[in-house]
Structures are given as C-alpha cells and as structure tokens.
From Swiss-Prot:
This is Glutamate--tRNA ligase. One of its GO terms (biological process) is amide biosynthetic process. It catalyses: tRNA(Glu) + L-glutamate + ATP = L-glutamyl-tRNA(Glu) + AMP + diphosphate. Keywords: Aminoacyl-tRNA synthetase, ATP-binding, Cytoplasm, Ligase, Nucleotide-binding, Protein biosynthesis.
Length: 571
C-alpha cells in the first residue's frame, strides 16, 4: 500500500508528541508502537510506516523543543492537551471526561440523617469545584426517602445549607427527594406497563433464597394489568408493611446476585419528619430507584460516587436501558480513612450524642464540619485538603495533620498572640516592682503594635515548665526578663544578669506567663478540656482565631463576663 498524506501526518503527530513529551528527538520504536496501536489501518504496511517514520524523525531531530511544540499545536492540538493532562500530579482535580464548558451538571446528594462529616465534605467540595471550573450547574439534592433506618433530621437540611455557605458555595438548585414522590410513582407505573417491574409478595428470606438460586419468584411473570392493580393497592394502603415490594425486572440469572430483580419501592407506614410530608406517603422509593430517576430528571452529566456504589450504577443502568436514556459519565473514588477518627458512621455518632457521650454535633471530638468549624478550621483549608486527595479508585488514608498544615498557612499570619497558662502555679519575682511588659501582638506583623501586660511581683506559670528545674536554674520569662530560681517551695526567683544570648547558648528554658489577675480560660479540644488562666485582652477576640503561645491555635468561642471558652484548632 502507498501511504497517504493523512497517514504521513498521523505518523508525524505521534513522533512530535514523543519529542515534546521527553524534550528530545523522538524514539522510533516507541513511536512505531504508538502508531500501530492507534492506527490499525497502517498495520498492513509496517515497512512503509517504518521508512516514513525514519524520515520524519530525521527532520524533527533538526529542530528544538519550541519548534516541536509549535508544529504539534498546529497539526494535533489535542495531543498537546493530552500531554498536559499526563503532566499533572496524581493529586488534584483531573479533567472530566467529555465535559464541555457551560454544560456540566453535577450534584451532591446526601441523606440528611445528620450533619455533614469530613467524609461527606469530600463530595461537597469536589463536585462544587468541578462545576465552578466548567461554569456548570451544581445541584444539592437531599436523598431523604428513608423514614426508618436512616431517618432524616429536620435540622440537618439547614446545617447542610449553612455548611455550603461557609464553603462559599451557593447551589444552583436545591431538591428534596421527599417532595417528588409523584414523579417516582409515575415512572414506576410506566415500568409496570412495560413489563419491566412487578409487585412481589415473597417474604424477604424466601425471595433471597430464590434469587441466590437464580430462580424467579412466583410473581415475576404476573401480567402488567394485575401488577398495576397491586401497585394501586400498595399506594392505597391495602397491604401491610413489607407485605409487598415493587421490583425492577433484570436478569434473574445474572452472575451478581445484587443485580437480580432489585427492590425499587417498599411499604413503610411511618411518618416523614418534614411536616410538609408527614403521613402523606406509605410507599417509599429505595435509593437506587429515586437516584436513577433524579439524575435523569435533573439532567446530570457527570457523577462522582464511592466505589462501594458501583453496584448502584449497574442496577440503575437497567432503568436507563428500559427508557432509552443515556447514563451520566460516572467516576468512582475510594474510601477515605482519617487516622484520628477511624471508622465512624452518622448513625453511631447520633446514638453517642443521644446517650450524652458527646455534647452535640459540634463537639470538638467529632469528625463533622460543624465541629471543625467551631474549632477554627477555615473553609479554604478544608477545600484544599479535599482537592489534594484527588479523584481515584484507590482508598485514601490521611491524617488530620495535613488539614491542620493547610489551616496553619491561613491563620498564622492573622492570629494575634496571647499567653495562656494551664495547670498554673504562682511564681514570685523577688525585688520586682510594678511593671508593664510590652509584648508583640504578632511576631512578624509589627504594624499591629504591642499588647501591654501589667504585673507586680507575682505571675502564673505552667507547672510542667518548672518540674525538672532546680534551685540555681536560669530561665527566661518570655518578653519580660531572665530569672534564677531561688526556691522551689514556695516558688521564687530573682532577676538574673545572664544575657539572653548566654541563656540560649546554655539551652535555658524560655517560658510564658500571665499575671495572677488574669482571666479564667477553658480550652475545649479533641483530647478533652483544659482549664487555666489567660492574659487580659483575650476576651476581645470573640469568634476570632488566636494563638496561645507554646500551646496552639484556638478559636474564641464564648465570653461570659470574666470567663472565656476557646476551642482548640491545632498546634
């Protein structure tokens, strides 16, 4: 065969791609493999391709990387884009397959049976960020059609909205599945009429036995008219709880039992917590059915979901096939394990809160967004933390320290510094006259000025700072003076003439302190509460992030007269 000009251009573009990728003249063997793999029509003339490739490589070798990239951009710009994708790090957001700017529609679909957790925040952040990148539409859909096992919490709807606001995200549309039962019922009727769904009266264990044996239940071949009659009776309340189930007809001999005639609707004579719904319905759609319908109705183009939901996609595909719909492009990601929290679920956390083990959903020991917000974690830190995980099938095991590191970059430049002494002991400075210590509000931002701390001859210090010292030990009271211990009981010191430089050379301790008339401070954190005394001025920082020197960053949560409550963020 004779190679056409188009064939020559194909060889040239792959040779150029190889050159641009590696920054040197292309490797003929690698290019040959690429050409033959991508262009089966050229396999009939390997010698002709090889000869053409030799000439092309020879010409390319005369150029430079800039010229190679310019030529590749001219004849095959898509290969430049492909190289850009491959050069991206494994972390971060990769381009969405088939995504078009302005046409991407994505959703985050939580069950509002509790507030957003760190685990669910991944979906909140990544989906909304993708929509932002592609200038698309972002939908918050509450999958709230389980009145029993994962019963919705009324407060959780607003909590999710509030958390999205905190993240700087305003959903383009908010949907509550519990408002859309008529839509689900309409599609159920259509499937029954098509002979693709049937009402099953088997007991759960009986159906499972038949399903596991790849045998149809006695109701599978009931004609559509009779199934419609049973369906209407289900809706009318003529059957009892779990007496009848509407099933989607799939392949009863499918190799995966989870895909065999799965349940789409069940009867549960329970009220919904939303007063607008209440006792309005007794036939409840299961998540796979409602989700399938919603993703079509709302025009979803892309879905990102956990790899544990791969079977959900396979089940839903039957509905899409029956109606002739195109399933959204779907990406699955692995589980996230956060070292400090291990395995947790919203239902177990809820029970622990109800039992009094935790003070509420914003208890600093919990892995909820409400809790980390209260502790002073910033939205931008969480967003970067989640985006850096990337989107892949591999399970992610990560420490909160990574989140803290991102947050530290944000709060360190803005947090005023204060002294806070925990487990305080009184220290007397012999011969000290009343003095006003001037201490920087921030170590590098000098424009903020100084904080003035008035003391007489006594201060409070942390007991642990004194524990291993002896009479004669020299240390420095930070931003005040160098002292030498003269007595351990009672604790007394005298001014020392030792210079700061000599103290540092001798590796003497530099400790913080507060006046004896400081204010009571309680710090609530993941490891429990710590009480102590803080310097005055902390009470003016309500809702701000501050740094308690030598302790950590904290958010001032409450000020009640002379008492301050702070929430620990991190070191």
């Amino acid at each position: 065969m004779t190679l056409s000009p188009e064939d020559i251009k194909i060889i040239e573009k792959y040779a150029l791609q190889n050159a641009v990728k590696y920054g040197k003249a292309p490797q003929p063997k690698a290019v040959m493999g690429k050409v033959m793999g991508e262009c089966p029509q050229l396999r009939a003339d390997p010698s002709g391709v090889s000869a053409a490739l030799e000439n092309i490589v020879s010409e390319i070798a005369k150029g430079n990387p800039e010229a190679w990239e310019a030529r590749l951009s001219e004849i095959a710009p898509e290969l430049i884009e492909a190289l850009s994708v491959k050069k991206e790090p494994d972390k971060g957001l990769k381009p969405l397959e088939g995504a078009e700017t302005g046409k991407v529609v994505m959703r985050f679909a939580p069950n509002p049976n509790g507030p957003a957790t760190l685990g669910s925040s991944r979906g909140m952040v990544v989906n909304s960020e993708y929509v932002k990148v592609y200038k698309g539409k972002f939908i918050l859909r509450f999958d709230d059609t389980d009145p029993d096992i994962k019963r919705p919490m009324l407060e959780a709807y607003d909590w999710y909205m509030d958390d999205f606001k905190w993240l700087g995200v305003v959903p383009d549309q908010v949907v509550r599945a519990s408002d859309r039962f008529p839509i689900y019922y309409d599609y159920a009727r259509k499937l029954i009429e098509m002979g693709k769904a049937y009402v099953c009266f088997c007991k759960g264990e009986d159906f499972k036995r038949l399903k596991d044996s790849k045998k149809a239940c006695p109701h599978r071949d009931t004609d559509p008219e009779e199934n419609l009659m049973h369906w209407e009776k289900m809706l009318a309340g003529e059957y009892e709880d779990q007496q009848a189930v509407l099933r989607i007809k799939t392949d009863i001999e499918h190799k995966d039992p989870a895909l065999r005639d799965w349940g789409a609707f069940r009867i549960r004579k329970m009220s919904h917590p939303r007063p607008e719904i209440g006792n309005k319905y007794i036939v409840w759609p299961l998540l796979d059915f409602a989700g399938a319908i919603e993703d079509h109705e709302l025009g979803m183009t892309h879905i990102i979901r956990g790899k544990d939901l791969i079977d959900s996609e396979k089940r839903q595909t039957y509905i899409y096939k029956y109606f002739g719909w195109t399933y959204p492009k779907t990406t699955h990601w692995g589980r996230v394990k956060i070292h400090e929290f291990g395995k947790f679920s919203t239902s177990t956390l809820r029970k622990a809160i109800e039992s009094g083990e935790y003070s509420g959903w914003d208890d600093p020991r919990l892995p909820t967004i409400r809790a980390i917000r209260r502790r002073g974690i910033r939205a931008e830190a969480l967003k970067k933390f989640m985006i850096e995980m990337g989107v892949g099938m591999t399970d992610v095991s990560i420490s909160m320290e990574s989140l803290y590191a991102e947050n530290r970059k944000i709060v360190d430049p803005v947090a005023n510094r204060y002294f806070f002494v925990w487990n305080p002991v009184e220290l007397e400075i012999e011969g000290m006259k009343p003095v006003v210590a001037k201490v920087p509000r921030h170590p590098t931002d000098h424009a903020r000025g100084m904080r003035e701390i008035s003391i007489e001859n006594k201060v409070l210090v942390c007991a642990e700072d004194i524990e291993k010292l002896n009479v004669g030990s020299v240390l420095r009271l930070k931003d005040l003076c160098n002292v030498e211990i003269t007595s351990l009981s009672p604790l007394r010191v005298k001014r020392s003439e030792t210079s700061l430089e000599d103290l540092k050379k001798a590796k003497g301790k530099i400790i913080h302190w507060v006046p004896v008339d400081g204010i009571p401070v309680k710090v609530c954190g993941p490891e429990g509460d710590i009480e102590g005394t803080g310097e005055r001025g902390i009470e003016t920082e309500l809702d701000n992030i501050v740094q308690f020197e030598r302790f950590g960053f904290c958010r001032i949560d409450a000020v009640d007269g002379e008492n301050v409550v702070a929430y620990f963020a991190h070191k």
